[in-house]
Regions:
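N-terminal beta1-alpha1-beta2 module of alpha/beta enzyme domains
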Residues: 1-71, 171
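Hydrophobic faces of well-ordered beta-strands that scaffold small-molecule active sites
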Residues: 5-11, 35-37, 69-73, 101-105, ...
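Short, acidic/polar
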Residues: 15-27, 177-185, 312-322
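Acidic (Asp/Glu)-rich catalytic clusters
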Residues: 25-29, 58-67, 89-101, 187-188, ...
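Conserved, mostly hydrophobic/aromatic
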Residues: 31, 61, 92, 137, ...
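Glycine-rich, proline-tolerant flexible connector loops at the mouths of alpha/beta enzymes
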Residues: 36-61, 76, 109, 114, ...
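Alpha-helix-loop-beta-strand connector modules within alpha/beta enzyme cores
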Residues: 48-71, 129, 133-136, 140, ...
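An alpha-helical appendage that flanks or caps ligand/catalytic pockets
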Residues: 123-164, 204-209, 213-325
């Protein structure tokens, strides 16, 4: 059984609640399949934003929408114990209803750096943390008893009684991953894989190989696994105006990769055909003049290498098809730029019908 091809929108939890809810509602009206919320961390203050709890925001979104699926894309078990993650997932099930919630877990390299996790000398890496988190969360959400003594986490909970008012529906769990170890873990232990920003079609092909290898090792059917790719994007009837938002978001992410997660990001940049020396001026511009100045440092050639879903509706359709053909089954479009609600509407009118 293969998974359906879906197109959704991803935003970061770094803007006021009302604004994020309005965007989710606009995406629902436009016909997008999923609204993902990635948890922003205090690093985004450098760009004039404030970090907020994505789990709190998504519960509000779920209660104020009707059809669109809501996804955590991602939250980190370095910030929440798996038992707490399961408790917050219960709230999402209550607010959204069965079948409207996807649970994404990831290490978040930038946050690990901020809180000192994953440093040299630590006993266990992200793969152990993710595996144990999935073990605990999945059993609790299924209503089972937990008596868990892992390398990282300890957890104890009795089984859910029949009379308890709680959903028994299965919640799909995803792992956000850039490297091969976690990508294979997504194949063996999760329902799907979510890739990081600056994903390109070549990176999708790379991730698909690792995801399917993990699935085969676990005796699972590779075609049943979902592969989501976070791709910066923007749209306008005018091609150049349609690329402005994607250019600015690409600038913020590329600067982040230079400043915070060099090393782990190499494979992303390699698959995009980018060198650190090529994008270092973007980070310099960010430090000196902020995100608008950094956007000016993103050349047309760099934006082309990033393979953003940006420009006119026809250009966006062409790029989405490229990702689909590379093996991406879940487009996570990170819309940025002026009037994102209108951009979502234009995607709904002129792009989404081509993929239905």
């Amino acid at each position: 059984m293969s998974v359906p091809f879906r197109i959704g929108v991803l935003q970061l939890s770094m803007e006021p609640l009302e604004q994020t809810v309005r965007m989710a509602q606009a995406c629902e009206r436009a016909g997008f399949d999923i609204f993902w919320l990635a948890e922003a961390y205090p690093w985004w203050r450098k760009h004039g934003f404030e970090a907020r709890s994505s789990t709190a925001i998504t519960a509000v979104i779920a209660a104020q929408t009707q059809r669109i699926v809501i996804g955590w894309g991602i939250i980190s078990p370095y910030t929440r114990h798996p038992v707490q993650i399961a408790m917050e997932a219960r709230v999402m099930q209550d607010a959204a209803g069965d079948g409207r919630f996807l649970l994404g877990l990831g290490a978040s390299k930038i946050f690990m750096k901020e809180i000192g996790e994953g440093e040299q000398g630590r006993d266990f890496g992200p793969a152990v943390v993710m595996r144990e988190s999935i073990d605990i969360v999945s059993v609790i959400l299924a209503g089972g008893a937990v008596d868990y003594h892992g390398k990282v986490f300890q957890a104890s909970a009795p089984a859910l009684k029949d009379e308890a008012h709680a959903s028994r529906a299965r919640v799909p769990i995803y792992i956000g991953a850039t490297g091969p170890v976690l990508q294979r873990l997504a194949g063996s232990h999760a329902d799907g894989l979510l890739t990081a920003s600056i994903t390109t079609p070549d990176f999708i092909r790379y991730a698909r190989v690792n995801l399917e290898e993990g699935a085969r090792r676990a005796g699972k059917e590779p075609a049943a696994l979902d592969l989501g790719g976070v791709i910066v994007g923007s749209i306008h009837r005018d091609s150049q105006k349609g690329k402005e938002g994607a250019r600015e978001m690409a600038a913020m992410y590329l600067a982040n990769k230079v400043q915070n997660i060099r090393g782990s990001a190499d494979v992303l940049l390699d698959k995009a055909g980018l060198q650190f020396a090529e994008i270092a001026p973007i980070a310099d511009a960010m430090e000196k003049g902020g995100r608008k100045a950094a956007a000016q440092a993103v050349s047309d050639d760099i934006l082309k290498k990033v393979r953003a879903i940006a420009g006119t509706p026809d250009e966006c359709c062409e790029r989405i098809a490229e990702y689909r053909d590379a093996g991406c089954t879940n487009i996570m479009l990170e819309i940025w730029g002026d009037d994102r609600e209108e951009q979502a509407k234009l995607f709904g009118e002129a792009v989404l019908p081509h993929f239905r």
